[in-house]
C-alpha cells in the first residue's frame, strides 16, 4: 500500500484513479476545487478543497497531506483547464489564467511535494500534459504553451532530483473522454477518445513499476491520431 496525493480528483481521470486506488487499499489524500464533488466520491480518503493557484495553497496542501498520511509515496497531478481559441482572439487574461492553472500550479505542487519526497529518498511524481504537451494544434496556442511548459518543467525537476530516489512520469495522452470536453467549444468524437478506465490502467502501471524503473514518458493516442 502507498500514500498517494491526487489533484483534480473530483472528476475524470483523477476520480477514476481515486476509486481504483481506494479499492486496493492505498491511503489517499484528494484535492479538487469542489468539496462537494470530492465528498460525493464516497471514498475513505482525506480531502482538500481549494485553488492551487491561490497564495500558499500548494504548501498547505502538501503539509496537510503529510499530516494526514504521515508521508508521501506518489503524487498524481491531474488538475488543469482547457482553452481552445484562436491566438488572435485570446485575451491577456485568458492566457495568464491558463498558464497559472496548468503550469504555475503544477510547479508549486512539484516544488513542495518533491522537497518532502526527496528527504525520504523515494517518491513518484506523475502528471498528464496530454498530447498537446508535445505536439502543436491550431486554435490552442495558449493551452499548448501551458502544456509544453509543463513538460519541460517536469523534465528539469527530473534532472535536478536525479539520483535522489525520486521518479517522474509524463503522460502524453490523446483526448480522454471526460467532462473536460463539456466546457470546450469544439466538435469532437467522444466515442473515438481514450476511455477514462484505459487512461487509469496506464497510470496504474507507472505506480506499480519496480522502484528502480520508471515510465518516463508515455504516449497513447486514438488510432486515427497515431504518431503525432
List each language-model region with its residue ranges.
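Conserved glycine-rich cofactor-binding loop
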Residues: 10-11
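Conserved glycine-rich Rossmann-like NAD(P)H-binding loop of the short-chain dehydrogenase/reductase
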Residues: 24-38
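The beta1-alpha1 cofactor-binding region of Rossmann-like NAD(H)/NADP(H)-dependent oxidoreductases
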Residues: 50-61, 92
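Substrate-binding pocket helix/loop in short-chain dehydrogenase/reductase
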Residues: 86-87, 94-96
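Active-site helix of classical SDR
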Residues: 110, 146
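Residue(s) in the substrate-gating loop at a strand-loop-helix junction
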Residues: 130
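C-terminal helical subdomain
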Residues: 163-166, 170-171, 188-228
Amino acid at each position: 500500500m502507498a500514500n498517494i496525493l491526487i489533484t483534480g480528483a473530483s472528476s475524470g481521470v483523477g476520480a477514476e484513479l481515486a476509486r481504483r486506488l481506494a479499492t486496493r487499499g492505498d491511503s489517499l489524500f484528494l484535492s479538487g476545487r469542489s468539496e462537494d464533488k470530492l465528498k460525493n466520491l464516497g471514498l475513505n480518503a482525506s480531502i482538500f478543497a481549494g485553488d492551487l493557484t491561490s497564495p500558499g495553497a500548494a504548501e498547505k496542501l502538501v503539509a496537510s497531506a503529510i499530516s494526514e498520511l504521515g508521508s508521501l509515496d506518489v503524487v498524481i497531478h491531474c488538475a488543469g483547464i482547457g482553452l481552445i481559441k484562436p491566438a488572435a482572439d485570446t485575451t491577456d487574461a485568458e492566457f495568464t489564467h491558463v498558464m497559472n492553472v496548468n503550469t504555475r500550479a503544477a510547479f508549486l505542487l512539484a516544488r513542495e511535494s518533491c522537497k518532502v519526497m526527496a528527504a525520504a529518498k523515494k517518491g513518484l511524481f506523475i502528471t498528464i500534459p496530454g498530447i498537446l504537451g508535445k505536439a502543436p494544434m491550431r486554435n490552442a496556442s495558449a493551452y499548448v504553451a501551458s502544456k509544453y511548459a509543463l513538460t519541460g518543467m517536469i523534465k528539469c525537476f527530473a534532472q535536478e532530483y536525479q539520483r535522489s530516489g525520486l521518479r517522474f512520469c509524463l503522460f502524453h495522452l490523446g483526448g480522454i473522454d471526460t467532462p473536460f470536453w463539456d466546457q470546450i467549444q469544439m466538435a469532437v468524437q467522444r466515442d473515438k477518445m481514450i476511455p477514462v478506465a484505459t487512461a487509469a490502467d496506464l497510470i496504474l502501471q507507472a505506480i506499480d513499476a519496480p522502484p528502480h524503473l520508471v515510465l518516463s514518458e508515455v504516449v497513447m493516442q486514438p488510432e486515427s491520431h497515431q504518431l503525432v
